[in-house]
Each structure stands twice: as C-alpha cells, then as structure tokens.
Design a protein with these regions (language model features):
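Short helix/loop segment flanking the catalytic signature motif in cyclic-nucleotide metabolism enzymes
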Residues: 95, 122-143
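Conserved nucleotide-binding and Mg2+-coordinating catalytic segments in signaling enzymes
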Residues: 33-53, 75-89, 97
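Catalytic-core segments of nucleotide cyclases and related cyclic-nucleotide turnover enzymes
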Residues: 89, 134-138, 142, 146-153, ...
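A short pre-motif secondary-structure segment
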Residues: 112-115, 156
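Active-site-proximal structural segments of metal-dependent nucleotidyl cyclase/transferase enzymes
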Residues: 54-87, 114
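Residue-level recognition of strand-loop junctions within catalytic nucleotide-signaling folds
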Residues: 85, 124-128, 167-168
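Signal-transducing coiled-coil linker helices
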Residues: 2-41, 49-60, 111-112
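Active-site-proximal alpha-helical element of nucleotidyl cyclase-like catalytic domains
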Residues: 91-110
Length: 199
C-alpha cells in the first residue's frame, strides 16, 4: 500500500514537472514567434510589422484625444547602393547596423525606433517638448555619425538623411499623411547632403 502511494506521488510530481516544462517551452516559443514577427533580425530594432501596429495605435489614440504632441522622424542612409556595389553587401550591412545603433542611441530613450525598410528608419516620439527632443536627438545623431566617420581605414563614410514633422490634425489629418511629410523632408535633407550643403 505504501509503495502504491509513493508511486502515485512520484507520478503526480513528474506530471506536474512535465506540465511546468511544457508551459515554459510554450512561453519561450511564444516569445520567439513574437521576436521573429516584430524584431528586425539584422539591427535588433522593431521591424515594419511593429511600426505598422504602432502607427495604428497612435492614430487611434490621436482620434480619442489621448496624445498631446507627436513627433515623427524619418531617416535614410545615403549611398547604400554605392557602398554595396563597391565594398559588398556585408560591408553595407555593417553600415545599416551602425546607422540603427546611432538612431537608437539618439532617440531610443525618448521614442519608438523602427527599421521600416532596407536602409530606412522611423521614430515616433509622444509627449511634451517633442521639438526639443528632436533637436537634441539630431545633435547626438550628428555627433555619433562624425565619431564613426573618424574610424581608421573606413572605406565609406556613413551619411544619414533625416526629416521630421510634428503632427497637427489640421495640417495632416492622419498619421500616414504626416509620415509622408517627414519622408519629404528627409529626401530634401538627403539631397542637401549629396550637394555638400549639410556636413
């Protein structure tokens, strides 16, 4: 009788442990699926799927009047195609990773940073004083960019184009239209960098 009880207790303990490990495995699997779906594998930033979710969430909060100020920033590397053609895609990837690091170091504590396409990035900053956050972030970005470009034996400099808008429903109507406005300013900046007007 005692042996039967002991065997029963052991079976229950083993069953409980198996269920616990299954739960842990399911959680790990769930975390891994989430990471694959919403995290950019190359840079570690949130990816386009995460960006689209955040854009939708922000639009809903704006529609409800729950957001006072919204800053939208867009960033794009200059000359990635030339870097890839001249030095190879792995060298270009290193520049993309460095670009992501610089943007995240400049804006990551204040906002949400995303890699939305090959060499294109976006940042949403929600809260008070977004213009100041932008100005401070761009100063930091330029400082980090200059620091990287002083790397010995660097084959190609890193040049990051940027543009921003502060959301205003009268001007833009939707977050999507505001993003287009930030895109336009970013491409103007990229052209100025190519012409040497911005260092």
């Amino acid at each position: 009788m005692r042996t039967a009880i002991l065997i029963g207790v052991v079976i229950l303990a083993v069953d409980s442990l198996c269920k616990l490990f299954e739960g842990i495995k399911e959680t790990e699997l769930s975390n891994k699926v989430f990471e694959i779906k919403y995290k950019d594998a190359l840079t570690g930033l949130a990816n386009r799927n995460a960006y689209e979710l955040k854009e939708k969430e922000i639009q809903e909060k704006l529609d409800k009047g729950e957001i006072d100020e919204l800053l939208i920033c867009k960033f794009d590397m200059n000359d990635l195609r030339k870097i890839n053609d001249n030095y190879g895609h792995s060298y270009g990837d290193r520049h993309i990773v460095k670009c992501a690091e610089i943007i995240n170091q400049s804006f990551g504590k204040s906002g949400y940073t995303f890699r939305v396409d090959g060499d294109e990035f976006a940042v949403f900053v929600i809260g008070d004083g977004v213009e100041y956050i932008y100005e401070r972030g761009i100063l930091r970005l330029k400082e980090l960019e200059r620091e990287f470009n002083r790397t010995p034996n660097l084959l190609a400099p890193l040049r990051i184009g940027y543009g921003h808008v502060i959301y205003n429903s009268d001007t833009f109507g939707t977050v999507e239209k505001a993003v287009s406005g930030a895109d336009k300013k970013m491409y103007e900046c990229k052209d100025m960098i190519k012409k040497g007007a911005i260092v």
